[in-house]
A protein has these predicted regions:
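Extracellular/periplasmic metallocenter environments
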Residues: 1-50
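Structural recognition of the beta-strand scaffold that forms the well-ordered cores
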Residues: 9, 53-56, 130
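Short loop/turn segments at secondary-structure transitions that flank enzyme active sites
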Residues: 27-29, 45, 61-63, 114-116, ...
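Acidic-aromatic/histidine active-site loop/patch
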Residues: 51-105, 109-115
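Solvent-exposed beta-strand/loop surfaces of large extracellular or lumenal domains
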Residues: 123-132
Length: 132
């Protein structure tokens, strides 16, 4: 595809769900620089919810000037297929507390795009159901 050009992919998506896409060529660096995005395939009959939220979690290794740090050839990071960052984001923004009305039904589509971090999540006393 030429620089600045476009290309339209046309393909069937047989399964509904929450997915994400990212490169597999030099993926440590490209994913580490943020080349990722959610891919949501809706059901034919989606559940009734008050809000359907996609939360893409990531951590970034930033240098002292708050730029994405280099060091893409670090053997430790490559051996572990990822690197721990020092700054967490949700949907590319600083982590914020999210509120909801009492009794609201929320669908959270959670994607962990961090290359080497396991993110612990909790519902803090709320009733939650794992769908998939």
């Amino acid at each position: 595809m030429p620089e600045g050009g476009t290309f339209l992919y046309d393909f069937a998506l047989p399964d509904a769900g929450t997915f994400w896409y990212h490169p597999h060529l030099n993926s440590l660096e490209q994913v580490g620089r943020g080349l990722t995005a959610p891919l949501i395939v809706d059901e034919a009959e989606p559940p009734e919810v008050d809000a359907d939220l996609t939360l893409m979690l990531n951590d970034w290794r930033l240098d002292a000037e708050a730029r994405i740090a280099g060091g893409w050839d670090d053997l430790h990071d490559r051996a572990h297929a990822g690197r721990i960052g020092n700054y967490m984001t949700v949907n590319g923004r600083p982590v914020e507390v999210q509120g909801a009305e009492a009794g609201a039904r929320l669908r959270l589509r959670i994607i962990n795009a961090a290359t080497d971090r396991i993110v612990m999540l909790g519902t803090f006393g709320l009733r939650a159901y794992l769908v998939a």
